[in-house]
């Protein structure tokens, strides 16, 4: 099947894919609770006669298309969970699950991969290797990608490269947006428990005010980026919550700070963590208090393989059109657990545009009015299919 035939098939399937997307959008489910979504995906795979394993890492599914004797293959991932947001779009297919919404486009991601599955199945005998389709749960919370990989998802057959995509409401429909290398940051959860000595507000000299101590710690942490890290190195230490004190006339004895650390590589992450601990503990000690620092590493940095990124960009330029590729000037300090895949095998994560000029509803991820242009589904399917075929061709040539 050539690219013209693939494009024609996408056009033929588009109306039904929109119906699938709207059904998923109407019935969003939170991380770890994607029961209906899992069943809906399985029903579509059953119609196509595609072999799969369900119940992976909770409600995830791994499907495989291609030669039964394939010794290697590529993987494509779509996340399937929704967010705890009450939808306000007023669309006829708006969420019927109160307080839950597909506000991050995972309904689009799932639909795109199901659309690609149809084409892969139609040309199964032409595939030069296996294509494994990862319908991944729990991206928004615990990182379902890591658990799917732990399920031995990247073997049987051996996966040589991996692809993933995300909708991007800042990019026009029909364009893709990606980084050649560094794409997203790592995350580390940060908790600092400041322990002072509570006392009456009229006699602050008789205690150690934990709120004052915590305030100095918060300010001092910002010097990590301005005075310790190189000016060209992106470093983020965010304190998102401060909890302390019980009464307006009492100097607090305890304060809890919570936030995140973000970096684009492990070396910088560890550098930040060391300085956070030193600053928090020594600042507290200077005031006669103590600080307990707890740091839990989350997602690793997401780094695209340069050769794979350039291959995908070339596919877009040739098949969507010149000017359809927008390379990122700088990496994003956001995070995505697709990084677990790219930390294991070379891969590429790219964004597909969902912004349509003159669209009535505002475009913003994690927003209660998020309403992406459904035309993006066509481009997502096209890039998944033609991108996978390009990578399989390249990997066969190297074999």
Segments the model singles out, each with a brief description of its role:
Residues 29, 79-81, 138, 168, ...:
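Active-site beta-loop-alpha junctions enriched in small/polar residues
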